[in-house]
Amino acid sequence: MQTKPHTLEGWLRHCEQLHPRNIDMGLDRVAEVARRMALRFECPVITVAGTNGKGSSCAMLEAVALQAGYRTGVYTSPHLVHFEERCRGHGEIVSAADLVPHFEAVEAARIQNGNEVSLTYFEFTTLAILRLMSHALLDVAILEVGLGGRLDATNAIDTDCAIITSIDIDHTEFLGPDRESIGREKAGIMRTGRPAIVSDPMAPQSVVDHAREIGADLWSFGRDFNFSGDKQQWNWAGRGRRYAGLAYPSLRGANQLVNASGVLAAFEALRERLPVTAQAVRNGMAMVELPGRFQIVPGQPTLVLDVAHNPHSVAALTANLDAMGFFPTTHAVFGAMADKDLAPMLAKVGPLVDRWYFTDLPTPRAESAAVLQQKWNAVHMVAGGRRDVTSSLHSDPLQALQAAVAAADPAD
């Protein structure tokens, strides 16, 4: 008989070995284990789906709710360094020790009465974190969808307010080949009679149609809420509430106002259960933090960290980099999964980069540095790129970053 793990690290290894596939779309298995655990939330649940902007939206929701004095729980994925980053309670990352009892509870429910249910790594870990949050006496639970929406493990919980951020082409093998089919999957988090905030200014018709079909309370960008602004401040207007003279969100990037607008619409839609003051909105937006989203690290050379991983988010990254002004040389450390649409990503940011540092990543899904370099060469040649651009190969991200920093001048 297999020994039960006693540490978070042990449980994560256990989860990796349980299911034959990393991604297995379907809610039946997750819903069955959730039913066995009697998993439910007493507080309002806000679920966020979208191709890009999910993490930023969750961080803004959390920041404003904390400033309003609410006890918050947030589930996001993936993590950057440590698994525990996926769950925050009252603004703080939970401890590994706090997670272990909930992994034990999921396993007990999974194998209950010898009727074993197979769960993927994501499904198992999601259920463990949801159970922790459901036991935490929260005022609001904020859930970030992992992939799609309709069949995602987070959708085992009925949301009180759905937010759908930008929709673009990504994960086509699971979600469909175009924005309409991808939008339809993401709209699956909506619930009848409950607010559904769609902050994509060009939302696919499939999202609007689904909201109408099920009778969700659809809040559309441009119709039910909007924003305006100048270089100093911005304004927001919803169905019955307005905010004027807001400071720009502390998260950098032109796209963050769209995300912030959806967040404020959600708070207006939930105002009877989660009222927030104008001061909480101002303070929360000014103080929100999120690693890896156009994150500028203090010091020289200027170091920007960004987790852009599809053409849409790379386009936003490129626009944000371009807006930073002139730097003598731009160095790019780049690693990516093999299933990503790499050519348009490289083509978009390519004109801004002078030196590339392609890196392997410690996961089987990753594209090798050598293949990344080949794909960049092909894109570079087609575009008739500059001959003074160089590239190099590295075995891991730290080595690549160290090489880039060593080669850079302070003004780069």
Where are these regions (language model features)?
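Internal gly/pro-rich beta-alpha loop/helix module
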Residues: D160-C161, F174-I189, G193-V258, L264, ...
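Hydrophobic anchor at the beta1->P-loop junction of P-loop NTPases
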Residues: I46-V48
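Beta-strand->loop->alpha-helix junctions that form or flank phosphate-binding loops
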Residues: Y75, I197-D200, R212-G229, S250-G253, ...
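Nucleotide phosphate-binding/pyrophosphate-handling subdomain across enzymes
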Residues: P44, H135, V140-V145, D152-I163, ...
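Charged, amphipathic alpha-helical linker segments immediately N-terminal to NTP-binding catalytic cores
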Residues: M1-R21
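Hydrophobic positions on the alpha1 helix immediately C-terminal to the Walker A/P-loop
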Residues: S56-M60
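ATP-dependent carboxylate-amine ligase catalytic core
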Residues: T7, R21-I23, L27, A31-F41, ...
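C-terminal helical cap/extension that packs against the catalytic core
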Residues: I197, P201-S206, H210-G215, W219, ...
